[in-house]
């Protein structure tokens, strides 16, 4: 009996102790009203800190991409759609540096040597020289000629120079160029501003030395010439500010180790002695101040003793009816195939199609129109990623986005709508050659799109001019990385709204290729290789092999074996042999056990 009563007593004590532990603290609070109640923090007031960029991870560079370490321990892989690095003599990736430095002896502004590439601009036009682009042992030097020089060069041996005509048969009426015109080096754009406070932004990720721009004012009355060195390319813009008697412009291209040939699409390809395409000049187009554009501009070439005369001729009827200034846009591009989409090996292809011009191909344009407009009709943008950004083996994708820059020009946001919703869709059509498919695509033969599923949308307003807009692609990109043959192609469509279509036609102008604000494809990931504090593991002893860790989230196995250590109050250290299951490969020769690294 005594034992039974004692057991009951113990049970009561334990029950009371348990009740005291789980009772709310307020039950024991003092009744003294002078003690203020504890401040309650609303959930809305608790915000996660912005994820900023700590710095670049140089070891993970590629020709067109960079990797950045983020403040939360994750990483960001960025593809710029064009080369931003070159390999040095040691095989290491270095930033392309187009910063201009004045060289007194050459009387020129010269970029750094980016591997085999270098570009130079004349300080003035006293000798008619404009710019030189060199790649290895080959080069192209561009210059102007006074009418007397031009007539002498183009005249038939039996013809009087005064009777000479241009390659397209027109009289040579071009005025003298302004030999006193001096170069103006334009201010470089604000780029690569890595911040940990406000979070990362697409406009802050552009490499800071990728481009430089110079301007020659009043080369001809009412005509300026602007040149931009970006990546490995040289872009020229003929800026016509007022009406002219003629819209024909002749340039002497002195070629070293190169020969020129006109292509069926109106472009010019420069090949070396082995037949390799070194440079190309895409078929030109022109655009006025209101955004109206035309392809009524063409090239003709005529071989001369030390190169070619390249004649650019624009349709006077179109130019005279346009809103000035009118910009005529030829570009000298490294390794060209077709137009401004550069090369079939490039990491990104961007173009658009318009219902208002259903048979027109727009792949030669530097910019893309999205929305609804009077000239192009309904505009769809297409983006193909020619391969996904490289991420380390074993890493997990946590986010992805595609970002495009909205032009600051007067037609950057054009129309009556206060806002323009743009939706992102997956392209369902696959192709054996996406490059050829897209450079020959018009509205009538556009790629098929899954319009039943909106992946993401963004709403654009006038305030977005001069900034990047973006779309979240996380779910789709995860599928791409898991697939063996993904299409890696998306389309950007305006929202379908009858009232919007009828009354509020609006388009935006975003850049498909630009030296300062190229499209940015960004993939966020976490590197799960090794032991990370934000994951949980099942830990077990592995005897002499060390300690084994099995990741709860991924199932990856890690084994850590300490091989050396030094105890010190000043600078202690340890060296571990780390096995990661994701690194395991079958190999007949290795300096470490298969799947292992030194940490």
Regions from the PLM with identified roles:
Residues 5, 30-91, 214, 221, ...:
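Intrinsically disordered, low-complexity segments enriched in small residues
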Residues 19-28:
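C-terminal segment of classical bacterial N-terminal signal peptides
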Residues 33-335, 515:
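Residues that cap or anchor secondary-structure elements
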Residues 243-248, 377-380, 390-402:
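Extended extracellular/luminal ectodomain segments enriched in beta-structured repeat modules
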Residues 249-255, 385, 395-409:
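A short beta-strand element within beta-rich, extracytoplasmic domains
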Residues 314-319, 492-512:
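Short beta-strand-plus-loop segments that form exposed binding edges in beta-rich domains
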Residues 327-390, 409, 428, 444, ...:
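Flexible, small-residue-rich N-terminal segments that precede or flank a structured functional core
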Residues 406-481, 486:
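Beta-strand-rich interaction/scaffold domains
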């Amino acid at each position: 009996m005594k034992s039974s009563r004692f057991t009951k007593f113990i049970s009561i004590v334990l029950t009371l102790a348990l009740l005291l532990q789980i009772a709310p603290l307020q039950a024991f609070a003092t009744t003294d009203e002078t003690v203020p109640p504890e401040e309650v923090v609303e959930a809305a007031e608790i915000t996660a800190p912005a994820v900023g960029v700590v710095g670049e991870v140089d070891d993970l560079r590629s020709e067109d991409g960079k990797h950045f370490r983020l403040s939360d321990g994750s990483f960001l892989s960025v593809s710029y759609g064009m080369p931003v690095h070159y390999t040095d003599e040691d095989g290491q990736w270095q930033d392309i540096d187009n910063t201009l430095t004045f060289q007194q002896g050459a009387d020129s502004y010269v970029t750094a040597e980016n591997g085999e590439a270098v570009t130079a601009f004349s300080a003035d036009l006293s000798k008619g020289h404009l710019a030189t682009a060199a790649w290895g042992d080959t080069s192209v030097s561009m210059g102007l000629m006074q009418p007397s020089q031009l007539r002498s060069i183009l005249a038939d041996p039996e013809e009087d120079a005064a009777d000479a005509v241009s390659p397209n048969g027109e009289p040579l009426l071009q005025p003298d160029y302004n030999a006193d015109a001096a170069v103006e080096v334009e201010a470089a754009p604000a780029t690569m501003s890595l911040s940990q406070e406000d979070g990362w932004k697409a406009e802050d990720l552009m490499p800071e030395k990728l481009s430089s721009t110079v301007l020659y004012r009043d080369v001809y009355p009412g005509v300026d010439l602007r040149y931009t060195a970006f990546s490995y390319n040289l872009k020229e813009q003929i800026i016509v500010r007022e009406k002219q008697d003629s819209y024909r412009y002749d340039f002497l291209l002195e070629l070293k180790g190169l020969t020129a040939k006109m292509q069926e699409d109106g472009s010019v390809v420069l090949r070396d002695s082995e037949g390799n395409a070194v440079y190309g000049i895409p078929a030109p187009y022109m655009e006025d101040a209101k955004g109206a554009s035309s392809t009524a501009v063409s090239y003709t070439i005529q071989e001369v003793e030390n190169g070619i005369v390249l004649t650019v001729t624009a349709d006077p009827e179109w130019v005279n009816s346009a809103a000035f200034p009118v910009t005529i846009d030829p570009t000298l591009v490294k390794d060209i195939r077709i137009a401004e989409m550069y090369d079939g090996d490039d990491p990104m292809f961007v173009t658009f199609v318009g219902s208002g011009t259903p048979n027109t191909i727009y792949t030669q344009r530097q910019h893309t129109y999205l929305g609804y407009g009077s000239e192009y009709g309904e505009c769809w943008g297409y983006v193909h990623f020619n391969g996904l950004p490289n991420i380390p083996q074993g890493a997990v994708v946590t986010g992805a986005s595609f970002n495009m820059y909205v032009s600051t020009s007067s037609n950057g946001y054009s129309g009556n709508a206060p806002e323009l919703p743009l939706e992102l869709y997956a392209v369902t059509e696959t192709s054996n050659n996406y490059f050829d498919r897209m450079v020959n695509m018009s509205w009538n033969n556009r790629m098929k799109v899954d319009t039943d599923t909106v992946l993401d949308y963004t709403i654009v307003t006038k305030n977005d001019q001069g900034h990047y807009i973006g779309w979240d692609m996380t779910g789709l990109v995860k599928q791409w990385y898991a697939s063996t043959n993904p299409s890696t192609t998306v389309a950007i469509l305006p929202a379908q709204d009858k009232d919007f279509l009828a009354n509020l036609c609006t388009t935006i102008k975003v850049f498909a290729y630009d030296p300062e604000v190229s499209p940015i494809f960004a993939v966020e990931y976490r590197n799960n290789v090794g032991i990370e504090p934000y994951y949980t593991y099942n830990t077990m002893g592995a005897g002499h092999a060390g300690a084994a860790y099995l990741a709860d989230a991924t199932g990856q196995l890690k084994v850590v074996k300490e091989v050396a250590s030094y105890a010190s109050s000043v600078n202690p250290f340890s060296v571990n042999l780390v096995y990661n299951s994701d690194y395991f490969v079958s190999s007949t020769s290795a300096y470490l056990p298969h799947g292992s690294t030194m940490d």
